[in-house]
Swiss-Prot record:
Major localization class: secreted
Gene Ontology terms, MF aspect: ion channel inhibitor activity; toxin activity
Protein name per its UniProtKB record: Conotoxin Lt3.3
Highest taxon listed in the record's lineage: Eukaryota
Leader peptide range in chain numbering: 1-24
Keywords: Cleavage on pair of basic residues, Disulfide bond, Secreted, Signal, Toxin
Entry text on domains: The cysteine framework is III (CC-C-C-CC). Classified in the M-1 branch, since 1 residue stands between the fourth and the fifth cysteine residues.
GO CC, alphabetical: extracellular region
Classification via InterPro entries: Conotoxin (IPR004214)
Family recorded in the similarity comment: Belongs to the conotoxin M superfamily.
Residues cleaved off as propeptide: 25-53
Length: 69
């Protein structure tokens, strides 16, 4: 009887809990999907700002996001 109870508890309670998707996982997945939709210029801008690097700009168009070449 005890073995049947353990098997039923495992199948009816523990197995469904292990297969549920956590709510904390979903925003990360959505965030990654949103990043794939960016155009290459926006993606490069985000990567460069994260690395703390700036691009080289041609002299009349210099601004804070890049340095003059």
């Amino acid at each position: 009887m005890l073995k049947i109870g353990v098997v039923l508890f495992t199948l009816l309670v523990l197995f469904p809990l292990a297969t549920l998707q956590l709510d904390a996982d979903q925003p990360v997945e959505r965030y990654a999907e949103n990043k794939q939709d960016l155009n290459p210029n926006e993606r490069m801008k985000m990567i460069m700002s994260a690395l703390g690097q700036r691009r080289c700009c041609i002299s009349p168009a210099c601004h804070e996001e890049c340095y003059c070449c």
